[in-house]
Amino acid sequence: MAAAASYFSGTALMPSQRSGAPAPEYSAAGTGAAAAPSPSKPRDPRFSGCVPATVLHISRSFAAALAADGGGDPVFSIDGVETTNVRVLGRVVSVVSRDTDVCFTLDDSTGKIPLVRWITDQSDTRDTSYIQEGVYVKVQVNLMGFQAKKQGLARSIRPINNFNEVVLHFIECMHVHLESVQSKMQRQLPPSVQTNEYTHVPSSGGVRDYQVHFTPQVNQGLPPAVQTNTSTYVPLLGGVRDHQAHFAQVNQGQFSPAVQANTSTHLPFSGGVGEHQIHFTPKVNQGQFPPSVQTNTSAHVPYSGGFREHQVHFTPPVNQGQFPPAVQTNLYNHAASSGGVREQVHLTQANQFSAYSSTGGLQHDPQRMVLEALQQPDILALEHGAHVDELVRRTGMPKANIMGVVKHLAAAGFVYWTIDDNHVKSMCNG
């Protein structure tokens, strides 16, 4: 039974194998003479059963095997791994029935393959009953013992009752193929697109320099203005090395200083921990616009000892002074210190409203006026909410505008209709 298990991944066994007899091999003429068993060879565990394959893949592998052997029984392999059993799925396009066998052609949309199923007992007759033109079947095929004839021996035939099995079969074919060729493809890639490498440079003391490249350095050799960025590390006399991160210095020198991208600068020092500076946004158009719309500039001032100042800017101060204080973004002020750690983090204070911040911050915003009217205590006390006419009276806006605003707020989930299309109530009841 161990020999039979190598031909099948399921429970479909040949009658001769169930009785314990060796599996027969058939010649191209169909005489039924048993061939001498070939010595066992070590194989990939993934190929111990039937390998899912397409007809196109089988045809290419068969042609390569015939060209390599030059005659006799070819050594069939899938992606370089020797195997003799494959599983194909397709539609039967032609059938020739005889007393001893049934020959049919299977088409899986990548090609056609001729197959034969020998009839020896009633179980074979049952399997051959599934072979009908236009029917989709799944076939386990043995490709040994046919000399130069391109014909496979159908070991097990099962009809397809769910079309999802067709999709699953092709997914399995792709999975097995990619698993087999993945390592080979990785070795064939040029060095410029291979995976990342890490460079470590020894230092005179302290912790070693650790350099990580997150993107491959492709097309290095172009003009410096379009090259990808390069991390630069400067040695120090002791302690921890300076850690510098560059987020792309593209087209440096091609434009005026106002539109050049930001450059992080780090200076060596005699001891302690180096300055850690991160710039999230480039300094674009600095000096071209008024100060109220200029982007943020990180400033670091050296000091006498301790840890350097750590400054993080999350958002640029855009349009400072143009809007009310509630919608202005924050400003940053950093001063040098004589020692210790000085870290100042300003979070954005935009649209600081008690509720409904997504409706905007203008004083006369129609949506805000309607929401404020619905938040009045006397309106909240009404069981069915406020009538549209009452909102018109309180806001002074036309009824058509009120209806449009209310529909928009209802779609956004801020208000809801109650007893009819004229009564509306706020989702926030105080």
UniProtKB/Swiss-Prot annotation:
One of its GO terms (biological process) is nucleotide-excision repair. It is found in: Nucleus. Residues 86-160 bind DNA. It comes from the Eukaryota. Residues 23-38 have a biased composition (Low complexity). Phosphorylated in a cell-cycle-dependent manner (from the S phase until mitosis). In response to DNA damage, recruited to DNA-repair nuclear foci, as a hypophosphorylated form. GO terms for cellular component: chromosome, telomeric region; DNA replication factor A complex; site of double-strand break. CDD domains: RPA2_DBD_D. Transmembrane segments: none annotated. The keyword DNA damage applies. Its main location: nucleus. GO terms for molecular function: single-stranded DNA binding; telomeric DNA binding. Keywords: DNA damage, DNA recombination, DNA repair, DNA replication, DNA-binding, Nucleus. Residues 14-46 are annotated as: Disordered. Component of the replication protein A complex (RPA) required for DNA recombination, repair and replication. The activity of RPA is mediated by single-stranded DNA binding and protein interactions. Belongs to the replication factor A protein 2 family. Heterotrimer of RPA1, RPA2 and RPA3 (canonical replication protein A complex). Interacts with RPA1C and RPA3. PANTHER family: REPLICATION PROTEIN A 32 KDA SUBUNIT C, REPLICATION PROTEIN A-RELATED. This is Replication protein A 32 kDa subunit C. It comes from Oryza sativa subsp. japonica. The lineage of its organism: Eukaryota, Viridiplantae, Streptophyta, Embryophyta, Tracheophyta.
